[in-house]
From Swiss-Prot:
Substrate binds at R27, Q28, A29, G30, R31, D77, Y154, T209, H327. This is Uroporphyrinogen decarboxylase. It is an enzyme of class 4 (lyase). Gene3D superfamilies: 3.20.20.210. It comes from Salmonella arizonae (strain ATCC BAA-731 / CDC346-86 / RSK2980).
């Protein structure tokens, strides 16, 4: 593979020295960019965009042409794995993702296949290989998956949810069925991420978007336990380099110590966690990624720069920080405000790296 020209992001995840704090944005390839909207229109619909390696590569690279980002992230969706489990994924206008055949009981779980990542999910691996080729070693490529718990919420609820009553009913009334589902998902995600790594992903991230809706005890048993299983099963070296793993639980700031015990390299923080406090608690063990409120990008440029300065100061001197938003960038953010954010991180962070 091509020599990596900018490895700041990988070095920061491994708590190694860097010249400036690396930065990327969750959902950096997305609807806030007019060029993304044009490519999506060309594809026809969202999943067609995900399943076309050339177009998925194009939208992955679009933000890198605008901004000096330190990493690219595979353009895909967390629901590719449930989709490959034959649940009939479709997207309802204004409703988000839906499944025609949600999981309702143990018998449904027993019928679910574990997808072959180079077969049913081969389009994702083709996208990874295409993106790696087109990146030409400029920056590393991040692969990702949803966490078992987060994927299960969509599969059991039949789509997006606000109250999560259907999956919580299963969790409390039929925990055995839910554990079987989560175990099958953990195996599927491990295979899926390892295939992404073999195809060229240089770091991987597990998005536990809905872990924060659980009690502390349920989080341990139904979310973190299965992410730990995945981390244990991942390839941690490929192409002569360590492959760092980041865990991100939205709303999980109270569980950082337990998350840091999984063997991951870094933890993603949402904007509700104080980064100085997080570093005091787990900075000796893991790197931290985050954590500006994505809505801050609506503010005037000077206010965005102030917030970047505050977060950099909160983390303080030394290595182990990847700057990011605390969740995905909003679709109506002015693209030039994202540019202000990225430039400010690089310019203002040099003083923290000697």
């Amino acid at each position: 593979m091509t020599e990596l020209k900018n490895d700041r992001y990988l070095r920061a995840l491994l708590r190694q020295p860097v010249d400036v704090t690396p930065v990327w944005m969750m959902r950096q390839a997305g609807r806030y960019l007019p060029e993304y909207k044009a490519t999506r229109a060309q594809a026809g619909d969202f999943m067609s965009l995900c399943k076309n390696a050339e177009l998925a590569c194009e939208v992955t690279l679009q933000p890198l042409r605008r901004y000096p980002l330190d990493a690219a992230i595979l353009f895909s969706d967390i629901l590719t794995v449930p989709d490959a489990m034959e649940l009939g994924l479709y997207f309802e206008a204004g409703e988000g993702p839906r499944f025609t055949a949600p999981v309702t009981c143990k018998a449904d779980v027993d019928k679910l296949p574990i997808p072959d990542p180079e077969d049913e999910l081969g389009y994702v691996m083709n996208a990874v290989r295409t993106i790696r080729r087109e990146l030409k070693g400029e920056v590393p490529l991040i692969g990702f998956s949803g966490s078992p718990w987060t994927l299960a919420t969509y599969m059991v609820e039949g789509g997006s949810s606000k109250a999560f009553t259907v999956i919580k009913k299963m969790m409390y009334a039929d925990p055995q069925a839910l554990h079987l589902l989560l175990d099958k998902l953990a195996k599927s995600v491990t295979l899926y991420l390892n295939a992404q790594i073999k195809a060229g992903a240089q770091s991987v991230m597990i998005f536990d978007t809905w872990g924060g809706v659980l009690t502390g005890r349920d989080y341990q048993h139904f979310s973190l336990y299965y992410m730990h299983k995945i981390v244990d099963g991942l390839l941690r070296e490929n192409d002569g380099r360590r492959v760092p793993v980041t865990l991100f639980t939205k709303g999980g700031g109270q569980w950082l110590e337990a998350m840091a015990e999984t063997g991951c390299d870094a933890l993603g923080l949402d904007w509700t966690t104080d980064i100085a406090d997080a570093r005091r608690r787990v900075g000796h063990k893991v790197a931290l990624q985050g954590n500006m409120d994505p809505s801050m990008l609506y503010a005037p440029p000077a206010r965005i720069e102030d917030e970047v300065a505050t977060i950099l100061s909160g983390f303080g001197q030394g290595e182990g920080h990847v700057f990011n938003l605390g969740h995905g960038i909003h679709q109506d953010v002015p693209p030039e405000h994202a540019g202000v954010f990225v430039e400010a991180v690089h310019r203002l962070s040099a003083q923290y790296h000697n």
